[in-house]
């Protein structure tokens, strides 16, 4: 059930926090290093709780979008800035956007969150480069995020947006599921596939009329 899966997800960072705290208490762990892990896992748990709350709001029909006219390029640049600390280890993020503003009616906070989630995944799995492109036609803007990693296991592709799905990597979660729900709230679509190198995520949402 949802609650069983949620409690399992929360248990993982809690166990790490408890383990490192006990290590400090027993004097068998470096205090600074253990404190860093505790802080990281606390942040991870906070993010997970927020995702669980948001997905439950969507399920109950209580997630309301606060729409405004937004230049999607600025939102994408915000996403790049958000993941730059993760990419600092040698991953180049290469943007390719139109020169003119690309206006969409969106909930700036929620859509930025969805894009940043895909970007952060891409940075983690990229070897050296993450390409972020934006294209627009009369009806839609298409955002494409492609890494140069190993791609997504073929057996995982049909389930990549499923809640709590544990794929070949052994990791599970609801980040991608929440991303899909946010895109759907914007009357858009999102899909994942493998390219010649790495994974490709494509988001399509309506442009402003």
What are these regions, as identified by a protein language model?
Residues 60-65, 103-106:
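Conserved micro-motifs of the catalytic ATP-binding
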Residues 40-48:
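Short alpha-helical segment of the dimerization/phosphotransfer core of two-component systems
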Residues 175, 179:
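Short alpha-helical Gxxx[C/S/T] motif in the catalytic ATP-binding
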Residues 129-139:
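Short beta-strand/loop element within the Bergerat-fold HATPase_c
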Residues 152-164:
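Short conserved segment of the HATPase_c
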Residues 66-69, 92-102:
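Conserved catalytic submotifs in the C-terminal HATPase_c
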